């Protein structure tokens, strides 16, 4: 992914603990491996990838995914685990992609989590929960979340990764509102 990003001029890539197939389905759950083995393998792989990312000048954003609705069987499901791995590897090119939708489903406490890990958040994804629709259609107070990101000093990108409740134009209007 890092080499492909460099080739096309992309500045960052999103990475996951498990390969995802069509519709975001986890390809292999690795049920035969313990969580300790999975964690150590992920650390070793990310350490090598971080070296490559540093050499190529590409940022990698490690995304935890919800395991209740969209990505059953995904290993990385909590911000804390991803952020602590990033802290241990200590590369400016490896950070967490904090997906508010996924983390609302897995762990809640969005503002507390942002406060605790803002130093390792490299990108933010936005969609409301439940449903993964535009802000204002679910239970997340996005005005509060965005204000909190700003108050914590987050200066990175915020991307909208969602399924419009009606159509794209209406979703864009809701996002701007």
Spans of model-derived segments:
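Catalytic cores of phosphodiester-bond-cleaving enzymes
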Residues: 22, 41, 50-69
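Substrate-binding cleft and catalytic face of glycoside hydrolase catalytic domains
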Residues: 14-25, 61, 67, 74
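Glycine-rich "substrate-gating" loop/helix at the edge of Rossmann-like oxidoreductase active sites
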Residues: 38-39, 71-73, 105
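Surface-exposed, active-site-proximal loop segments in enzymatic domains
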Residues: 19-38, 174
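Histidine-acidic metal/acid-base catalytic patches
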Residues: 3, 9-11, 24-26, 59, ...
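An active-site-proximal structural segment forming one wall of the substrate-binding cleft
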Residues: 1-12, 16, 37-56
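A short, mixed-charge helix-start or loop-turn motif at secondary-structure junctions
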Residues: 28-35, 64, 68, 127-128
